[in-house]
Amino acid sequence: MRVLPATLLVGAASAAVPPLQQVLGRPEEGMSFSKPLHAFQEQLKTLSEDARKLWDEVANYFPDSMDHSPIFSLPKKHTRRPDSHWDHIVRGSDVQKIWVNNADGEKEREIDGKLEAYDLRIKKADPSALGIDPNVKQYTGYLDDNGNDKHLFYWFFESRNDPKNDPVVLWLNGGPGCSSLTGLFMELGPSSIDENIKPVYNDFSWNSNASVIFLDQPVNVGYSYSGSAVSDTVAAGKDVYALLSLFFKQFPEYAEQDFHIAGESYAGHYIPVFASEILAHKNRNINLKSVLIGNGLTDGLTQYGYYRPMGCGEGGYKAVLDEATCESMDNALPRCRSMIESCYNSESAWVCVPASIYCNNALIGPYQRTGQNVYDVRSKCEDESNLCYKGMGYVSEYLNKAEVREAVGAEVGGYDSCNFDINRNFLFHGDWMKPYHRLVPGLLEQIPVLIYAGDADYICNWLGNKAWTEALEWPGQKEYASAELEDLKIEQNEHTGKKIGQVKSHGNFTFMRLYGGGHMVPMDQPEASLEFFNRWLGGEWF
């Protein structure tokens, strides 16, 4: 998860941008929440007096600069490439015209969904041009939503092993508003980027035994662009369904394989929605078999109760916060929970936005002000301008090279790892605190769900992730909640028997704690990451 620079504490992304390391000052006297959000003035007039007082209190968390910040993301500079540049263009309108006879002899669309406004542009990339996995087939391109001027960039890597039989995985980074290409080059892709801004082969890439699609979503993230904005998870889900439907239509050889969705951080919001969107379509060409969420934000009501324990030494690492701060966080938690409960009951932005801002300032803010890395309790924030990691700066510099943008067919003038306008959009639409965990029981009825967590992360810590999985109401809750954590050991290489974490599972639900992993487990523990990933895809726990 990421947060807004120089505006407010929104949560997980806030730790690494310099202005966010400071206590946010009170606005000038008399300022109310309606001042920075002029578009909401009329709506504010309809609120009760108590509600308006709450919003005015929330305004205290905003610096004056918020008054000059746009609420919606600005369009990126871009130059669209001619159709002749692409090897294939799959038009959703053509796919919608394909009808088949069902088992009852009735005509129906081959693929469900409203796809007519979408096109998928595809180019076979030349791996030798960049030196990234040169022996692996790659495709790059854009999903175009022509009706809304949205263009999502993707990069596909075929499996290094047996692409005709290996599964296909969609990888999503979080934010909201952070590029999945950071996951590609910092965590689990075929190459990382070193301090010389050169690609370095990754022996532990997740495409070792699976084909992987990295998607820059929502729009205006990474190489993606738009003249409009997406500001909630549900809207983004429609785009992902269209991308997969058209991609698998063009490449039926991949559609035959098992398909999984994996992601981390704010993908704890995305994935339940995206998977539910896919499963809602009876006639689909997406063979969804499971989902994997790493260090995710999924159930804020439960998870926010574990910031104090994690920061105060109860998560397996020494305390970062002092006793007085821990007590202050304990005192703030009841009000935070009450506000989140109200958000869950109404799912209204008017309730969910104050809950997000109050809780993040009360329970994440104290940790941020220590200067410690919110993504890893063991270390200081080493590079405040790049979300605590120098490597993110290397990735951005690499992806901004003209020759790289040309090689992958990027149409934007520049690349940013995270777009904080998008982050703000999701916040102000109330998306941050909405109860997307309520979709998980429906998923468990149809597919396995893995929740994994590096145990050194603060922002989406393992204590909170374990707790929400045990609190989730579903038919197998009692058996799952009572199951004990068991040792997770390496089985597939020369380090056989090495303990890499703990696991518990019942039915379709599995939780893993990964030792020594921060917010980005594949970066911190690449061997352990590939181990559990391969075994999960192999069906060991389901």
From Swiss-Prot:
This is Carboxypeptidase Y homolog A. Residues 18-123 form a propeptide. Its main location: other. Keywords: Carboxypeptidase, Disulfide bond, Glycoprotein, Hydrolase, Protease, Signal, Vacuole, Zymogen. GO terms for molecular function: serine-type carboxypeptidase activity. Belongs to the peptidase S10 family. Residues 1-17 form the signal peptide. It catalyses: Release of a C-terminal amino acid with broad specificity. InterPro entries: AB_hydrolase_fold, Peptidase_S10, Propeptide_carboxypepY, Ser_caboxypep_ser_AS. The active site is at S265, D457, H519. Pfam families: Carbpep_Y_N, Peptidase_S10. It comes from Aspergillus oryzae (strain ATCC 42149 / RIB 40) (Yellow koji mold). Its EC number is 3.4.16.5. Glycans are attached at N209, N508. Disulfide bonds join C178-C418, C312-C326, C336-C359, C343-C352, C381-C388. Vacuolar carboxypeptidase involved in degradation of small peptides. Digests preferentially peptides containing an aliphatic or hydrophobic residue in P1' position, as well as methionine, leucine or phenylalanine in P1 position of ester substrate. GO terms for biological process: proteolysis. The keyword Oxidoreductase does not apply. GO terms for cellular component: fungal-type vacuole lumen. PROSITE patterns: CARBOXYPEPT_SER_SER. It is found in: Vacuole. It is an enzyme of class 3 (hydrolase). The gene is cpyA.
